[in-house]
Amino acid sequence: MEIHEKFEQTDFGKTLAGRVRYDRYKPKDVSNERWIELLGADVNNLTHLTLTYGLAQDFIRTAQTLQPDLLTSEDEQLLQVAALIHDWAESIVGDISFGDKTANDEREEQAAFEANLASFYKGDLTLINKARTEIVFDHTGKNKLGQVFNAIERVGYLRTALRAGDHIIRGDAMDCDDGLHWLVADVLSQQPKALIAYAETLQPVGQYLANQHDKISLMFEIIARSDDVFDNYPPDQREAKRLQFGESYQAWQQYRLA
């Protein structure tokens, strides 16, 4: 955590601390403080890093029990470093929603990270550089640690969507209800299919999906009854987003029956 403690004291860390994630779903008249109160640490750009660090530790602990040959001790160390550093460059390029981020956006973020690394962290960069190249900016999709970290990030998105779903079910955040529905719809459209695929080789992912099975199923059912949620997208995207959600829902139903 020393890496994070040093970074959060920089101007870059302070910039992240003042920003929220999932901003596109937040009603404009709702404060950042209220948004964080509802959805927790994942919503603040800086504390998202330590939350992801915690998710990485959870994955590592579960893998040590269920899949002890999956990760070496060095793998475990690099995953935790990657969690703490992966969004540092967003202090410069900003946060882009998962479904909107393009390959060009990824390249710009990587370039900003590399150009400013010495300012982000003044210390030994050996582990940071290794995590950066092998995990954070691994674009091959074939590297084991890159896949594990991608799965951890996707679990983070789903976790926050399920927290939003809790507020929908309880009806205790009506000032944000439409935005929470949209957040849940967007995440359910994008994350479950990939996580189902990861569950075939990464047992901690399979356990997470099993533990959250009923809640995920309920949120799919709620969004399936809320067709107007897709009106939040630009008109030229709405039909594609409906289809994407439908395909994801179908994949989840098939997974439930497997």
Residue ranges: model-predicted function:
Residues 1-258:
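Alpha-helical, largely C-terminal catalytic domains
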